[in-house]
Amino acid sequence: MVKLVFARHGESEWNKANLFTGWADVDLSEEGTQQAIDAGKLIKEADIKFDLAFTSVLTRAIKTTNLALEYSDQLWVPVEKSWRLNERHYGGLTGKNKAEAAEKFGDEQVHIWRRSYDVLPPAMAKDDPYSAHTDRRYANLDDTVIPDAENLKVTLERALPYWEDKIAPALKDGKNVFVGAHGNSIRALVKHIKQLSDDDIMGVEIPNFPPLVFEFDENLNVTAEYYLGK
């Protein structure tokens, strides 16, 4: 029986300020740092031993991964970073206050942008200060691959190859895996793992804490799903 632990990053400074974050590289808040530490402690209490870990290329997820591994006494575990585990790209909403966006565009429209499976938010301008096109961490990517906006459908389409190439093979090899990622990249993978419908995934929320655990048999059928400490 192998285990996959999903840890959404702890609260970020922009979570705290109620801003759309997406691919903007925002740090953890003080509360978020503590959540990551507490995640590690829960993992240690549950005696889950990892063989490898995966995270995005965004600071808040990287720090959460490192802290969770450190406080579960597993900081030595190999960690691979990939842009494919990044948060969903919120396009032109990035950096905007969620309440102010609702006032400007209407509650219903903002809700559709946030929760629908296949509706895109407004695209980010190429010269936007938060544009990934000029960010060095994406220098090895073809410019056409870098998104200017994503919905959950597109997020799953770019995360799924990483699942199939890296994460699923590790689980099939009997390895326990830690994934430190983001609310929507985790939601996308949960949709695939549980084969949820487009409508059902709309009601799924991934909290900053505690970590979500899946247990699988040798054929990657889910045998258990639970949040640590609950």
Swiss-Prot record:
<feature type="binding site">
    <location>
        <begin position="114"/>
        <end position="115"/>
    </location>
    <ligand>
        <name>substrate</name>
    </ligand>
</feature>
<feature type="active site" description="Tele-phosphohistidine intermediate">
    <location>
        <position position="9"/>
    </location>
</feature>
<keyword id="KW-0413">Isomerase</keyword>
<protein>
    <recommendedName>
        <fullName>2,3-bisphosphoglycerate-dependent phosphoglycerate mutase</fullName>
        <ecNumber>5.4.2.11</ecNumber>
    </recommendedName>
</protein>
<keyword id="KW-0324">Glycolysis</keyword>
<keyword id="KW-0312">Gluconeogenesis</keyword>
<feature type="binding site">
    <location>
        <begin position="21"/>
        <end position="22"/>
    </location>
    <ligand>
        <name>substrate</name>
    </ligand>
</feature>
<feature type="active site" description="Proton donor/acceptor">
    <location>
        <position position="87"/>
    </location>
</feature>
<feature type="binding site">
    <location>
        <begin position="87"/>
        <end position="90"/>
    </location>
    <ligand>
        <name>substrate</name>
    </ligand>
</feature>
<dbReference type="InterPro" id="IPR029033">
    <property type="entry name" value="His_PPase_superfam"/>
</dbReference>
<feature type="site" description="Transition state stabilizer">
    <location>
        <position position="182"/>
    </location>
</feature>
<feature type="binding site">
    <location>
        <position position="60"/>
    </location>
    <ligand>
        <name>substrate</name>
    </ligand>
</feature>
<comment type="function">
    <text>Catalyzes the interconversion of 2-phosphoglycerate and 3-phosphoglycerate.</text>
</comment>
<dbReference type="GO" id="GO:0006094">
    <property type="term" value="P:gluconeogenesis"/>
</dbReference>
<comment type="pathway">
    <text>Carbohydrate degradation; glycolysis; pyruvate from D-glyceraldehyde 3-phosphate: step 3/5.</text>
</comment>
<dbReference type="InterPro" id="IPR005952">
    <property type="entry name" value="Phosphogly_mut1"/>
</dbReference>
<dbReference type="GO" id="GO:0004619">
    <property type="term" value="F:phosphoglycerate mutase activity"/>
</dbReference>
<dbReference type="Pfam" id="PF00300">
    <property type="entry name" value="His_Phos_1"/>
</dbReference>
<feature type="binding site">
    <location>
        <position position="98"/>
    </location>
    <ligand>
        <name>substrate</name>
    </ligand>
</feature>
<dbReference type="GO" id="GO:0006096">
    <property type="term" value="P:glycolytic process"/>
</dbReference>
<feature type="binding site">
    <location>
        <begin position="8"/>
        <end position="15"/>
    </location>
    <ligand>
        <name>substrate</name>
    </ligand>
</feature>
<comment type="similarity">
    <text>Belongs to the phosphoglycerate mutase family. BPG-dependent PGAM subfamily.</text>
</comment>
<dbReference type="InterPro" id="IPR013078">
    <property type="entry name" value="His_Pase_superF_clade-1"/>
</dbReference>
<feature type="binding site">
    <location>
        <begin position="183"/>
        <end position="184"/>
    </location>
    <ligand>
        <name>substrate</name>
    </ligand>
</feature>
